[in-house]
Amino acid sequence: MTATAAKKGDAVSSYDVVVIGAGAAGLCAGALLAREGKRVVVLDRSPYPGGRAMAVPDEGFTVNLGGHLIEDGGSGLTKVFEHVGKELIHGEVSKEMPIWENGSGWGSIRDRYTDRAELKKVIKALADTPYSELDDWDDRSLREWIHQHTSDQGVVDLFEFISVLECMTDNWYDHSASDNLYVRKMHYEERNTAAYSCWPGQGWDGLWRDLADAITGHGGELRLGTTVERVIVENGAVKGVAVAREPRVLPNEFFEEEILEAPAVISTLPVWHVLNVVPRSVLPEWYASQIEFLAQDKFRIAWLGLYLATEEPVTQFDPRELSTWTATPSTDCSGFMFDQSAMDPSCSPEGTHLHVLGAIIPGAKGRDREWCRATMQAFERDVETMWPGLANPVWRRRHLVFEPSFGVIQMPGLVGKYRPHWRAPNVEGLWFASETFRSRGVGTDRAARAALTCVEDYLGARIPTFGDGWRY
């Protein structure tokens, strides 16, 4: 380590790989690397593991930073657990999809695609399409691809309502074909269904605890409450990271650092934060500009969220249903709702049902507190119309999913090859295992696959456990 990287007297520790972030991607990357015998440390500024899918207690309830389900048919996050000696328990699986239509109320998605022959035709076309051909649809919409195979609006509705439930877009009709169809194809191949989602049987906190145990059990380190100040790059190669001194007594303390030496760094930071830690100057202008373009607020997936607890359930057809809509009675917000207690009774006190709801908003409005407050008030009034049983909850928590965001919106031209590559150009030893960079999937499974892609690239070989399962 040269004088530019560390001052005399600084503490220095050495690793094979430093992983920045202890969310799904960081924990998966750390566990995989430790399992492969690498000396790895995973760092996160939060005291909780799990990133935006962390689970925290609140007055007897267990809540996340917005609603979460696992959308892995078995070849992604589940396989990571298997490889590191753990089991990802697939708990309750979501069932049914009630659709709210302003003016007519609730109905089932099944009522919309009455001609199952048309749906089967689309499923066969997708099964016959190799993943490589789906890459050609990065800049075209989902409905354009579907219309090649059917004009049945019910089939279009099925695919587009799934995109609303996955919270990957604000305008359901303007969703990237490739990103959606990658997931549909995986779910059909692995679970014989268009959209598979389940609750982790060990709970979200247990899921992250298991991955943390896998890291330390294989000789790695996990350091929570540790802020990475910068990635150290010299002469085009990674040399390590600098972390802030803890505890930080002065709130404006600056450049008091501990140096962690490593020839490789895997960052899981999203596009809107990564250039705060990776010096922009070490990246090519075109690549840094790609990151900054995607980091615009208007491309953030954002929603106004509600946790509402009641003594009686309010579901329409099945306790584990995922309800969705494209507009509420007084807003243009699409959204979702499910009874979290039906998926995991331990997340709420006995005799209560904890419902989680989200109203998707434009990312460009995420910093407009006045607009968000007014829209939240309108949404809450609409909730009482859509579910009269939610009018008088026994417990409530409002939240805004914006910082952290759920991801970069999956509009045509903002996915696949239009995102920054996961390997930093012109910098030896730097990878980006973030779902906001080039990746496929949904939520925690997308993050796990991004981690696997970067780990295998670092290792220079595919890990046999994962066979031919999809990853970049």
Task: Give each language-model segment a name.
Residues G105, I109-M186:
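Rossmann-like flavin
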Residues M186-E256:
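Helical element adjacent to the flavin cofactor pocket in flavoenzyme catalytic cores
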Residues V17-V42:
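N-terminal Rossmann-like FAD-binding beta1-loop-alpha1 element of flavoenzymes
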Residues L306-P404:
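C-terminal segments that line or cap access tunnels to active or ligand-binding sites in enzymes
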